[in-house]
Amino acid sequence: MSDYEEDEAFGMDGAVMEEEVDELEMIDENGQSQQGVSHPGEPSTTVITEDVASSKTAQSGKAVAKEDRTTTPYMTKYERARILGTRALQISMNAPVLVDLEGETDPLQIAMKELAQKKIPLLVRRYLPDGSYEDWSVAELI
């Protein structure tokens, strides 16, 4: 047994080692900002509810019209994970479920079922380098 066995989170000088992560803004259904983790190299995206997207106070910047979108209609694995996690959290906090449950009790499984049927009422906001953004509904993404 060593003297430092229980001090696994400390560096050589005894200081606490902290992990650095990039922050990504997430807006919940009340329009309040939440913090999340983004992955290096991933374009900046935000998951928001449809009613927040229609309000002018949600974010500054200019929206791109649907017919002028430049990003692909494919959902990235990071967007998928973010959408499923957000929706599972909503379901666990007693949000209405939009699919037949058929005995399902796990919020993540219910969220996956909603995603498969394209019934998740969320938008993906993709920010572009010029400061504008594109809103994609989950039903539009492949």
Swiss-Prot record:
Keywords: DNA-directed RNA polymerase, Nucleus, Phosphoprotein, Transcription. Phosphorylated. InterPro entries: DNA-dir_RNA_polK_14-18kDa_CS, Pol_omega/Rpo6/RPB6, RPB6, RPB6/omega-like_sf, Rpo6/Rpb6. The keyword Nucleus applies. Gene3D superfamilies: 3.90.940.10. It is found in: Nucleus. GO terms for biological process: DNA-templated transcription elongation; transcription by RNA polymerase I; transcription by RNA polymerase II; transcription elongation by RNA polymerase I; tRNA transcription by RNA polymerase III. The keyword Glycoprotein does not apply. Belongs to the archaeal Rpo6/eukaryotic RPB6 RNA polymerase subunit family. This is DNA-directed RNA polymerases I, II, and III subunit RPABC2.
